[in-house]
Amino acid sequence: MTDKTEKVAVDPETVFKRPRECDSPSYQKRQRMALLARKQGAGDSLIAGSAMSKEKKLMTGHAIPPSQLDSQIDDFTGFSKDRMMQKPGSNAPVGGNVTSSFSGDDLECRETASSPKSQREINADIKRKLVKELRCVGQKYEKIFEMLEGVQGPTAVRKRFFESIIKEAARCMRRDFVKHLKKKLKRMI
């Protein structure tokens, strides 16, 4: 009997694995790994792929030499190396430095005009963020109160919003936070 135990201890090939143990990772782990690979691969989109192909072409000698590539890039952007504006068809500079006439206010106006959101969309976004913050253990409530101030609409909408957040906080066992929310709700009414 001791011979068998010694043989098992010395020869691992005779040891049988349990049915639950296998060499490949579990299904969930494989799914997580695949998701990570997709996320990491998302950064390597067409831009990175085209850069890789250009580098490979330059290494193999089938593409444009680097000196000609610089001039073609300059033609494409319309700027020479000395930051002078150029005509698209030629390498002759037009003259003068290029400056931007846009201010930060113009940019903010364009962003709001290009993507107008309704009150419902904004409030739904705030509610999603609030619920996420509520579920985090040990959070400070100042951030949540700041988000609650961003709720848009009449007082009836704000009141419903506060009531739904109070219910969510009670569900998450945040009694002290519920007290603070009820005080704010009374002040609002």
From Swiss-Prot:
This protein's UniProt keywords: Nucleus
Q: Where in the cell is it found?
A: Nucleus
Q: Describe the family membership recorded for this protein in Swiss-Prot or TrEMBL.
A: Belongs to the CT45 family.
Keyword Nucleus among UniProt keywords: yes
Q: Report the source organism.
A: Homo sapiens (Human)
- Classify the source by domain of life: Eukaryota
**Where expressed (tissue)?**
Testis specific. Expressed in cancer cell lines.
Q: This chain belongs to which protein, by name?
A: Cancer/testis antigen family 45 member A3
Pfam families per the UniProt record, alphabetical: INT_SG_DDX_CT_C
Region spans: Disordered: 81-119
Gene Ontology CC annotations of this record: nucleus
